[in-house]
UniProtKB/Swiss-Prot annotation:
One of its GO terms (molecular function) is RNA binding. InterPro entries: Ribosomal_eL30-like, Ribosomal_eL30-like_sf, Ribosomal_eL30_CS, Ribosomal_eL8/eL30/eS12/Gad45. Belongs to the eukaryotic ribosomal protein eL30 family. This is Large ribosomal subunit protein eL30. SUPFAM superfamilies: L30e-like. It is found in: Cytoplasm. It comes from the Eukaryota. Keywords: Cytoplasm, Ribonucleoprotein, Ribosomal protein. GO terms for cellular component: cytosolic large ribosomal subunit.
Amino acid sequence: MAPKSNKNQENINSKLALTIKSGKYTLGYKSVVKSLRTGKAKLVIIAANTPVLRKSELEYYAMLSKTPVYYFQGGNNELGTVCGKLFRVGTLSILDAGDSDILSSI
């Protein structure tokens, strides 16, 4: 079963990279909460090593705004690398997917 989940993770990684190149997104806890509160977020991605309290707050705001949440398998270092950034990314919200079909695949 591990190869299937690994392939699925690579598929999500490539779709996320395409979204970063062609769509609109916000990085970081404060901007993700702001996009959830205003209703602009279409998808929230949370890294695996995000603190529990922060994760539960994001889940709460996502539940209020009826926004889907995806739990990234890797830590915030890996999520930052997938996004093409040289820093850690704990949370990100996708405002517009651009050319990617990540919203329908998750």
